[in-house]
Amino acid sequence: YFTQELSSHDFIWYGRYPNSTEQFAGLQYWVENGGDLLAKLPAVNSAVVEVWQRDISIPDGESYSPGYVIYMDCKLDEGVTTDEVYNAYYAYAQAAKKEGDNLGRKIMFPVTGAEGYDHDFLIVMYANSLSDYGKNNDLWWDKIIGQLPEQQALAEVGYSCENRRSYTSMNIK
């Protein structure tokens, strides 16, 4: 998710877990048992990127395939901290949820392996399914855009995002 060279990648492996305990249990299982699966995949693992991430919101319900994920590269304005952005985004997500929003949102920070990445963080938005994303998109236009003070506060906190890109996703178990 830190690359501009999408044509050079067959897929992006994105692990989605409800918390760090399950994330690292999944990683342990992969390290101990994933070699056979990796050998069968019709692709070459060209990069491993480690990120720290904080959940802003988690969608209710089950995750179905196919899903939908959006990434945006973001930079902080001078003197603004990631905690300020997170807190404003969290307040906005909670207000949007009261209106019926059910998107998952994360703020992600590259730690290792993201060569050439010159942004401070990523914003990630995802839905449990393609149809759920459609419902949330309609909700955005009908009830949220320009109507929530928390959205205005988020817009004024002091950061900018670019390079919005979206992917479909599928569950692999």
What are these regions (language model features)?
Residues Y1-K173:
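Short S/T/G/P-rich N-terminal loop/turn motif that feeds into the first structured element of a domain
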